[in-house]
């Protein structure tokens, strides 16, 4: 396909998750999309070269195998380098498109075309199980102190109560669509986060020049933390690390000082105490290493 004919580029990062990735690609084909598109898979340092196995099943896909895990942002950035579509749709490999995806995704692209001041969209995100349960229907801003926010609709049954288009402060990393020209202007994802908070930081950067929206006219299914696991040491390390980095990069003046004090000396130590009492020493170690790594990163870039 000539690169000028491609309307949409799906960008998918795979890490030891070939089963989920194949299921996602199956859902793309089953949706019988009515617009030109390409599927890009970045195998981000899997133990085996899973890209070649995926390519054998679906010869038309594009992508590559990278022998080092570059993290969520780094993998997506490799996809950006390859993609030629007018719009980039970043979707986690543990998501599934619905059968209605053709019309819904076309609607997202039309909305972005008609509103050039919009920098990105995230659709309604539903859990794979239980059925019809919301994961994401927009979000509140992050607290300036705790660096936490609320995902609207989380855990609720989808009864149409979040079917209103709304401006949001942050895109959801499991599913976000951006025009290529927006990325050309603001740059690629900040790869130093490796995992977690990179889409929040990117959203802050995009939001300085554009507006971001929750787009309920489209939806996707997400299996949640199939790739990292709930409360895994990996997840604990990077959440503890990256909250500190995000605060240092995006909070200003006294807000930054108070946020860092809270994250390190209040929330950080309280988390450590809880994990100690619970006897979760592996998670405790990951948490403390994460905080130490975050503090070290901040000191290096001062």
Predicted regions and their residues:
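Glycine-rich, basic loop-to-helix element that forms the pyrophosphate-binding segment
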Residues: 65-83, 93, 99
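Short aromatic/hydrophobic "clamp" motif used to bind/position activated sugar donors
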Residues: 88
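Non-catalytic, C-terminal membrane-associated alpha-helical segments of glycosyltransferases
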Residues: 234-242, 253-302
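A short, conserved alpha-helix in the catalytic core of glycosyltransferases
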Residues: 169-219
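N-proximal low-complexity "stem/linker" segments adjacent to membrane-targeting elements
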Residues: 1-30
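Short, flexible, basic/aromatic active-site loop/helix in glycosyltransferases
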Residues: 141-168
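A conserved acidic beta->alpha catalytic loop
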Residues: 18, 27, 43-51, 68
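Conserved donor NDP-sugar-binding/catalytic core segment of glycosyltransferases
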Residues: 96-136
């Amino acid at each position: 396909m000539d690169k000028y004919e491609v309307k949409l580029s799906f960008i998918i990062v795979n890490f030891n998750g070939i089963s989920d990735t194949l299921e996602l690609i199956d859902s793309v084909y089953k949706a019988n999309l009515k617009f030109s598109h390409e599927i890009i898979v970045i195998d981000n340092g899997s133990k085996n070269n899973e890209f070649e196995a995926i390519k054998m099943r679906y010869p038309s896909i594009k992508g590559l195998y990278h022998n080092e895990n570059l993290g969520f942002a780094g993998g997506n950035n490799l996809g950006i380098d390859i993609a030629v579509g007018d719009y980039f749709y970043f979707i986690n490999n543990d998501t599934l498109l619905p059968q209605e995806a053709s019309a819904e995704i076309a609607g997202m692209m039309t909305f972005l075309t008609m509103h050039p001041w919009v920098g990105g969209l995230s659709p309604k995100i539903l859990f794979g199980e239980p059925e019809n349960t919301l994961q994401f229907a927009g979000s509140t801003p992050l607290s300036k102190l705790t660096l936490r926010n609320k995902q609207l609709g989380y855990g609720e049954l989808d009864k149409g109560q979040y079917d209103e288009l709304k401006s949001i402060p942050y895109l959801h990393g499991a599913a976000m669509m951006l025009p290529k020209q927006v990325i050309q202007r603001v740059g690629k994802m900040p790869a130093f986060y490796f995992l977690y908070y990179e889409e929040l930081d990117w959203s802050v950067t995009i939001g300085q020049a554009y507006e971001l929206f929750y787009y309920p006219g489209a939806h996707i299914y997400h299996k949640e933390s199939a790739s990292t696991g709930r409360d895994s040491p990996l997840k604990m390390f990077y959440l503890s690390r990256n909250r500190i980095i995000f605060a240092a990069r995006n909070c200003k003046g006294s807000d930054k000082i108070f946020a860092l004090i809270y994250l390190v000396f209040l929330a950080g130590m309280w988390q450590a105490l809880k994990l100690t009492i619970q006897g979760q020493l592996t998670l405790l170690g990951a948490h403390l290493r994460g905080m130490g790594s975050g503090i070290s990163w901040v000191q290096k870039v001062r």
